[in-house]
Amino acid sequence: MFRVFGSFGSKGNQSSGEEQSTKTKQVLKQANDFEIALKAMDFVLDDRTDEGLNLLKKAEMETGSDQTILTLARGVIEFLQATLSFETEEMKRAAITLGKAEQMSWKSKQNAEKTNFRSSSIYPPGTVYAVTYTESCLLHALLMLFSESMMEAAKALLKLRRAYTMLQDIMVTVKKAERSKNSSSPSPSEKSQESCGSFVSAETTFISVDIPYKLSSEDKSNPLLLEFAEKIYTMRMGRLSGAHIGNTPSFHRLRDDLGLQTTPSQASDRHSVSDDFDLEQATIDEFIHSGANLCYGILQVVLSLLPPAIGAVLSIVGFKGSREEGLRLVWKAIKERNVHGCIGLLGLMFYYDGPFQFTDADFDIPPNDNGSRALNKSRTNDSSLLPGYMDSATLLHPGKILEDALLKARALFPNSALWLLNEAKMLAGKGRLRDSLALMDSIDVNSIRMRQVKSLMVFERAILLVNLHEYNRAADDLISLLDISDWSHALYTYFAGCCYLENWRMTQLGLLNDGKEQFYKERARELIFDAPSLLGKKTFKSKNLPLDRFMLRKVQQFNNMQKKLNLQEPLDSIATSPVHELAYFYNGYNRMTENDLILTKKMLTEYHNPAIDSEDPDQELIRNLLLSLTLRRLGDAERGLALLDDIVLPKIFYIQNGKVKYFKKTEDPWAYPAALYERALFCWKLGGMESLNECREWLLRAQNYAADYELSTRIGMKIKAALDRVENALA
């Protein structure tokens, strides 16, 4: 007997003769086209977009191909390109394709239900197209929200509402199927015997896990069906091992640790695909539950992070998000070896180590044992979460589990700079800045095929170089982005100017002696004060980005100070070094080493110019806020707290009749709620678990400073995430 693999699940009604043979061909064709779509998307994740798109184009031209999944695959590829660059034309193209996929998915779902086309042994007819519909809806809605058009935003909410409702129904079916499968799972020995593929030429019959019903004797011996089923099996096994896109099996490259100098694990030689994945899982079933887990998980996390006022309104119309449940589902999705797992991993990397600091490393509150769940390292078909498995690997602090997931992606996609970049960011998050830089420098950015990934690599390296105070290279990277990305030429230019300004100040303090003092001075003046003129030349969105508006306000401040003090040199009108503000927005203070922090402290306290010596209250507030953070990171939390309590906070709020009253300041509005957030963090660092109630009070004060300012989303989400963590610990 030829066994493609595994059993065929529950039995369905048998058709007779030619009718059933035609039906079986359709079922296998659908599985084949889904495998082609998954392969095409994996090409993109390996920095080989053209190969992926060519594969889709070839498949689309075949008679009888599943145009729905092929169109969605193209839409996902274009979505990844658009969200990595946020460029207008790419976002428009992705939106059009996803809109088509949405319409096609709905029609395919209705047709499958009407004809009772059953391609899964555990899910009702049409379920897979319900998943493609919600996936295209969700991605399309996100693009509409990014457009910043009120009309498009309203349409996006309607799409999200439809996706949310359908996903709720799908998840009921998925959970029911998982419970049924777990209760009937065979023993490991039985599973091993059933999973072994074999071929005996004297008996050319077969069964396939992709066919959800019992085959007729004619179909079992049909050589064309046998060959088609074997092809799908080979495609799936290649995908699971990572060998399907021309790379050698991924386990040969799998490492145990992060960093450029690490070598493949010795255990990789004994590794088997069956160690990680369920070999009896049909392609359609895999797509259904990985897609449902990913989409519903992301939607839940996003809803949970919305500001309270918006969240309360949405909950009235049925939108409610649970961050823990959402994270749990995304973690389940990344266990799958497909594009859903990869997108889920990118989402988790952004959540745990992104610029919004949803999990501030300094706010390391241990999880509440009653409310948190530990992540299980089990296979896909087992229960994905078990309490108490690993104390250090919870939903709050995934630790080594997140690291291992990223290392698997690096092994699977050795040609992609996207995963290398994420490894470098993870190293930086651990304070290993030099190791992170070495990893980034190990690749020639000009060899990166995806322009969007190339621009991300260059920008992230510039941020890292700023944290290392290597401002020459940082400025070079930022200026080079003018030829790579259309995202924000004004911000790139301003940021580069701030780097040159810091170098000029370092030469004045004798900390840098390279004979380029005049060059730094001229470039800083030119780039900082010319940056606003570039705002009208960028191509992204109809409105300026939040950081664009921040930059514009800062340059206006400098110009006003120059007039106020009647200064000849524009650079003397800049008080607190703006590069340190930008470092805060990108989590720099949590990543700097001790030596880097010492240099930051020196630059904040020892440099003087007319603007600094004028002791402008707003500029002093910024300087003292950043200095207090620096002191805390250097281990002098008591002194940092005194600075915050005595000098910074009295300028932000006061207590009247037991109620908090805020000074509504407009000069640097991001700093006021940020200072209240940092006060909560001081409270935690000095008081530990006994101070959680006080931490909560400070975070509520930060959250209630509900002014609309240019960085309100970034700061507000960080505050809400911390508040949720504190309240979870207090529960």
Swiss-Prot record:
Among its keywords, does the record have Glycosyltransferase? no
Any single Gene Ontology cellular-component annotation? mitochondrial outer membrane
Its annotated compartments are:
Cytoplasm; Nucleus
Q: Does the keyword Iron apply?
A: no
Q: Which segments show compositional bias classed as Polar residues? A: 10-26
| InterPro entries in the cross-refs | Iml2/TPR_39
Keywords of this entry: Cytoplasm, Nucleus, Phosphoprotein
Main localisation: cytoplasm
Phosphothreonine found at: T380
Instruction: Identify the stretch(es) annotated as Disordered.
Output: 1-26
Q: Which residue positions does Phosphoserine occur at?
A: S265, S268, S378, S383, S392
Please explain the role this protein plays, according to its UniProt record: Inclusion body (IB) resident protein that interacts strongly with lipid droplet (LD) proteins. Involved in LD-mediated IB clearing after protein folding stress, probably by enabling access to the IBs of an LD-stored soluble sterol derivative that acts as a chaperone in inclusion clearing.
- So what family is this one in? Belongs to the IML2 family.
Subunit annotation: Interacts with lipid droplet proteins PET10 and PDR16.
Q: Please give the name of this protein.
A: Inclusion body clearance protein IML2
Q: Which organism is it from?
A: Saccharomyces cerevisiae (strain YJM789)
